[in-house]
A protein has these predicted regions:
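Short, flexible helix-loop junctions that flank or precede catalytic/ligand sites
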Residues: 1-374
Length: 374
């Protein structure tokens, strides 16, 4: 048993999302969004480096010895699966272990908007799931792949860095390929996947112009493409795609988005009202003729109005979704406020702006009784 497994076992037992190990501080657990130290001494440099090198392959050890960062998946002796990032910093080495649930969560369990399941019914086009690091994008995509795997007969090719959730083939065939192990880059992975008779291609991250371009080609040629971007709203997602590609391809990119982008789902993880978990709250854009025209005429700043008016199509602004979750007493109002994009407008619904304990969409006044959701 690797020595590092003891910390991972403790983290799993505590239900944490991440285990952080760094020189000069005790091991820390990410619990419901907060970083909590465990009762242990500060880790020493030589000690932690020994813990880490025990779980590396020969090739990974060579790269790490040269000062390179590492991203890989790891299965502990207890059977726990983790996504790992190993790095060096000013005081020495460090590592972050993201816990991956043993079972792929369903869309229903994640309580995502019903429109997310309907996106899995499309046969071609692009769906983007976006958000900052650690907002559950990979989990949402895994749930979508699982839904496709159970409800349709498809050839699904998933390109990941690293492989997180493992998908046994059910009604569909699921082929999972890992960056650095099976493919040299996401762009090359998409290029290869298109020669493998795919129905669905998942691209773990649209991180550069070449990958975006290849993913666009796949979506235009009759495949359903799922991908992620580190953007925090639907508008920023569209602008990022347009700006990522060469200026001379700008018109072509806008045309692609107008014709082949199906939806953008942007999510954040907000503390639940009881403080014992986090809930995904989503902004949803569904492509319409009106939004397509705004993209083509470079008036993306007007898209939020379309989201606000498009609730019958499954669309919603992030702030709308946050307010609805607060009204339903499912999330902590204080934490929800920190994710609001238009905080000044958001505050109009808050009865106590100094404490932000209660939000009421009806506009009626309510005397707050505590600093938490009722």
């Amino acid at each position: 048993m690797a020595r590092i497994d003891a910390f991972l076992k403790l983290g799993t037992q505590q239900g944490c999302s991440d285990v952080h190990l760094a020189v000069g501080v005790p091991p820390m657990l990410r619990m419901h969004g907060d970083l909590m130290p465990i009762k242990f001494r500060e880790l020493r440099g030589v000690e932690l480096e020994g813990y880490i090198t025990e779980i590396l392959t020969h090739a990974q050890n060579q790269l790490f010895a040269k000062g390179g960062d590492l991203d890989f998946s790891y299965v502990s002796t207890e059977g726990g699966r983790f996504r790992v990032n190993v790095y060096r910093k000013d005081t020495g080495v460090g590592a972050t272990f993201r816990a991956i649930p043993a079972e792929v969560p369903t869309l229903e369990k994640l309580a995502l908007p019903p429109i997310v399941a309907k996106l899995c019914d499309f046969h071609q086009g692009m769906v983007l799931v976006t958000g900052s690091t650690g907002t559950g994008k990979s989990t949402t995509l895994a749930a979508m792949i699982d839904h496709l795997n159970q409800t349709r007969r498809l050839n699904i090719i998933s390109l990941e860095d690293p492989i997180e959730f493992v998908h046994p083939s059910k009604n569909s065939q699921v082929i999972q390929r890992e960056l650095g192990t099976h493919i040299p880059s996401f762009a090359e992975g998409v290029r290869a996947a298109m020669r493998e008779d795919p129905d669905v291609i998942l691209v773990g991250e649209l991180r550069d112009a070449e990958t975006i371009s290849m993913a666009m080609t796949a979506a235009e040629t009759g495949h359903l493409v799922l991908g992620t971007l580190h953007t925090t709203s639907a508008v920023k997602t569209i602008d990022r795609v347009i700006d990522a590609l060469p200026v001379e391809e700008r018109e072509q990119t806008k045309s692609f988005l107008a014709q082949s982008l199906l939806a953008v789902v942007t999510q954040v993880l907000v503390k639940t009202a009881d403080g014992h978990g986090r809930k995904a709250i989503c902004e949803v854009l569904m492509m319409t003729k009106a939004i397509a025209k705004l993209i083509q005429t470079e008036q993306t700043h007007q898209i939020p109005t379309q989201l606000q008016m498009g609730r019958d199509l499954g669309m919603q602004l992030l702030d709308q979704a946050l307010l609805a979750a607060i009204t339903a007493h499912s999330v902590d109002p204080d934490d929800a406020y920190t994710y609001a994009l238009e905080k000044r407008a958001f505050q109009k619904y808050v009865t106590d702006t100094s404490m932000l304990p209660k939000v009421d969409l009806t506009g009626s006044t309510t005397v707050p009784t505590s600093n938490s959701a009722a």
